[in-house]
Amino acid sequence: MSDVNAHLLAQRIDTVLDILVAGDYHSAIHNLEILKAELLALAADDAEQKNQPKAPWEI
């Protein structure tokens, strides 16, 4: 299971908010798209790990 660092995530969201306040909407949207892609990749890794068959000693 992946470990999402809540503090790091909050910092990245804060950065996007700062960019929005500065008026650079294109960069803010781009940063949100990057963050979304990274979070979806983490979720996909979690789902892939959960779907792997367990070894007989793990059942």
UniProtKB/Swiss-Prot annotation:
InterPro entries recorded: UPF0509
Pfam families the UniProt entry points to: YciZ (PF23675)
Family per similarity comment: Belongs to the UPF0509 family.
Name of the molecule in the record: UPF0509 protein KPK_3153
Organism (species): Klebsiella pneumoniae (strain 342)
Lineage of origin: Bacteria, Pseudomonadati, Pseudomonadota, Gammaproteobacteria, Enterobacterales
